[in-house]
Amino acid sequence: MSAALPSIQLPVDYNNLFNEITDFLVTFKQDTLSSDATRNENEDENLDAENIEQHLLEKGPKYMAMLQKVANRELNSVIIDLDDILQYQNEKFLQGTQADDLVSAIQQNANHFTELFCRAIDNNMPLPTKEIDYKDDVLDVILNQRRLRNERMLSDRTNEIRSENLMDTTMDPPSSMNDALREVVEDETELFPPNLTRRYFLYFKPLSQNCARRYRKKAISSKPLSVRQIKGDFLGQLITVRGIITRVSDVKPAVEVIAYTCDQCGYEVFQEVNSRTFTPLSECTSEECSQNQTKGQLFMSTRASKFSAFQECKIQELSQQVPVGHIPRSLNIHVNGTLVRSLSPGDIVDVTGIFLPAPYTGFKALKAGLLTETYLEAQFVRQHKKKFASFSLTSDVEERVMELITSGDVYNRLAKSIAPEIYGNLDVKKALLLLLVGGVDKRVGDGMKIRGDINVCLMGDPGVAKSQLLKAICKISPRGVYTTGKGSSGVGLTAAVMKDPVTDEMILEGGALVLADNGICCIDEFDKMDESDRTAIHEVMEQQTISISKAGINTTLNARTSILAAANPLYGRYNPRLSPLDNINLPAALLSRFDILFLMLDIPSRDDDEKLAEHVTYVHMHNKQPDLDFTPVEPSKMREYIAYAKTKRPVMSEAVNDYVVQAYIRLRQDSKREMDSKFSFGQATPRTLLGIIRLSQALAKLRLADMVDIDDVEEALRLVRVSKESLYQETNKSKEDESPTTKIFTIIKKMLQETGKNTLSYENIVKTVRLRGFTMLQLSNCIQEYSYLNVWHLINEGNTLKFVDDGTMDTDQEDSLVSTPKLAPQTTASANVSAQDSDIDLQDA
């Protein structure tokens, strides 16, 4: 027979701690400076900001104001901030009063202190300051019925005493009546469990980083832990875990208190449930049934029972937390009360909770022996990246947004701030910025929906930073999912049927596209996907839904996501001998769903290669990008600006509509003329028109405008044209070296040949040239340079352009004008400088 373990007495006086908790709740007042510091540091998770504002205005105790709102049914959660307790302890220390280390005690035994705080709150709960109808809640109805029953019991007891001549009707009630009243009141207080009458959920908020640094005792680490670092000595303690949420169950009702009704005496019997399993009561335990020796049968009263929202989540280690050669570990999280639905799959979070064991029950207990499962009972959640929809547009956020606008050139600055360590690719970064902002969703009266999300495909040679751009977008986007084509199946992208471990029901587990709802799904190695898996994306890219019919489940899931795909051409590298469609090797049905398709070619160029090599070597040497001519915008500020821009819903005026229609007709005609050429990209489809509209709306959002301007449409057309022109190489090498001035001259000369006259309207020239993606500065330089060469002149106060030789010149003269850079050196130099200073980055045709 084994000897008993020695008993020890812990030096913990819980009565003294309970008195300190009561004093803290009643007397604590938060100073303005500390509350502002806490709000600035924890701006994302300020759940009780309204209560802080209220008590600061009233200059009263913070938690008593919070309890008053609980009593008035305006608040259903009480958040105990450990920063406030630490401030309370410091104030007691400065006053010369020795107080126990309450913060350390809560961190080491959080589960027990939850009950202590609840008892202190119950004892100090104020009366409601507004009238509350007893019909509002089921518990109010039960309490009201119990109060009426007690009054009847008192009346019956009074009549019984009078009938027994124990008192005279003219005399005051004797002590027996007071004793009977006291017994009835005590029975009422003992009848209802404390957990049944509580109308709030209590949570602990961990120490902030500033307070944790100043905290003298480091018994519990305030830094977030990985799942691998959680050991057995953390059981019962308040810890913080950092990871990514991989699975979230449905919200189910979890029973806390079960109410039974006896069929003999009519009494209510309550049973508290503190575990996952329980044994229902069957026999009545009331005093009346015991005295009458009648075994009344209990029937469960579901309406009088108390249920709370329950959700089970699974958190997994981040990739940087996993050692070499290991697989990520995971931990179950139990979420109760008002914290449910605060976690979503794919979120990177810091979850503060109580680390508790869950012993095996049933047959598992016989096999597992002393082993137990562990879980984290969530107390507080801090999101690393807030969703765009959950951004609170406070005055501080608006001030930072306006500061960014006043700095000027927001469009180019934000685009350059996307992965500044990656050299060049400014137009690609501009398209990715518009993808982050998105267009405007439209819903027609008959229910048809027009998507506003923008889809972009990056196709190019290996080593041009496609994957790095994808990961940069995932980092900036609050809800970004990164996956690869070969490592993803159709089920992994859409949804899979699996068994719920909580309820053992068949449920749908969302894939990458569902997890990226209201976000961005980045798919790398898009060309390596199987054709059967790639077809699952067709519905998502246009209809933004996923239709599922499997395992008896017929439903439609939302996948309101933007697709950012990266792919390599056929045979790995771009082959200039093949047409662009052959190089791209994607079906036309999928190709037309992309608003922009960039081809990023790795073309040898001495100047570009030298700049790229210098950039890469500098990054390797200093672990940062070279000094830029601007200050990159931080990802957090960029998210705030994009969230602010997403609140705008710009519309198009009649003039802009006509301009878009004419531009689309010209695109269709150009694609029709190029259909027979070797370098044809394909037919321009109506989806191209919708893509131009979405890009224009995104540009208007970036300007924080309510109307789409013609300049927005022109920039969208320029991006579309640049993306189209980058899909093929010109066979004539000399055309690649043409300056913008020469290209504009070619366009005007072609217009002259089509009209057959020697004059052109300056307004038509401006419209055509800007439609081709050139700026007014470049057009002005072109007209000035060729006027100096006596090729044309502006007449009629600048409204008409007239050719000197009736537009007819021989081939030798034309070639000399186009290819002679030495004429008018000052004008040419000024044109080149102006082109470099232009906001629009031109690509070679």
Curated annotation (Swiss-Prot):
Residues with PTM Phosphoserine: S819, S838
Catalytic activity: ATP + H2O = ADP + phosphate + H(+)
Cellular compartment(s): Cytoplasm; Nucleus
Keywords from the named record: ATP-binding, Cell cycle, Cytoplasm, DNA replication, DNA-binding, Helicase, Hydrolase, Nucleotide-binding, Nucleus, Phosphoprotein
MCM domain: residues covered: 410-617
Main localization (coarse): cytoplasm
Enzyme Commission identifier(s): 3.6.4.12
SUPFAM superfamilies, A to Z: Nucleic acid-binding proteins, P-loop containing nucleoside triphosphate hydrolases
PROSITE patterns linked: MCM_1 (PS00847), MCM_2 (PS50051)
PTM-bearing positions, type Phosphothreonine: T811
Record-level GO BP terms: DNA replication; DNA replication initiation; DNA strand elongation involved in DNA replication; double-strand break repair via break-induced replication; nuclear DNA replication; pre-replicative complex assembly involved in nuclear cell cycle DNA replication; premeiotic DNA replication; silent mating-type cassette heterochromatin formation
Any one GO molecular-function label of the UniProt entry: DNA replication origin binding
Motif Arginine finger, residue numbers: 592-595
Coiled-coil regions listed in the entry: none
Listed Polar residues bias regions: 825-837
Pfam families: HTH_MCM7, MCM, MCM_lid, MCM_N, MCM_OB
Gene Ontology cellular component list: chromosome, telomeric region; CMG complex; cytoplasm; DNA replication preinitiation complex; MCM complex; MCM core complex; nuclear pre-replicative complex; nuclear replication fork
Biological function: Acts as a component of the MCM2-7 complex (MCM complex) which is the putative replicative helicase essential for 'once per cell cycle' DNA replication initiation and elongation in eukaryotic cells. Core component of CDC45-MCM-GINS (CMG) helicase, the molecular machine that unwinds template DNA during replication, and around which the replisome is built.
Family: Belongs to the MCM family.
Note in the entry: Present with 166 molecules/cell in log phase SD medium. Early fractionation of eukaryotic MCM proteins yielded a variety of dimeric, trimeric and tetrameric complexes with unclear biological significance. Specifically a MCM467 subcomplex is shown to have in vitro helicase activity which is inhibited by the MCM2 subunit. The MCM2-7 hexamer is the proposed physiological active complex.
Subunit structure: Component of the MCM2-7 complex. The complex forms a toroidal hexameric ring with the proposed subunit order MCM2-MCM6-MCM4-MCM7-MCM3-MCM5; loaded onto DNA, forms a head-head double hexamer. Interacts with CSM1 and MCM10.
The protein's name: DNA replication licensing factor MCM7
Gene it is expressed from: MCM7
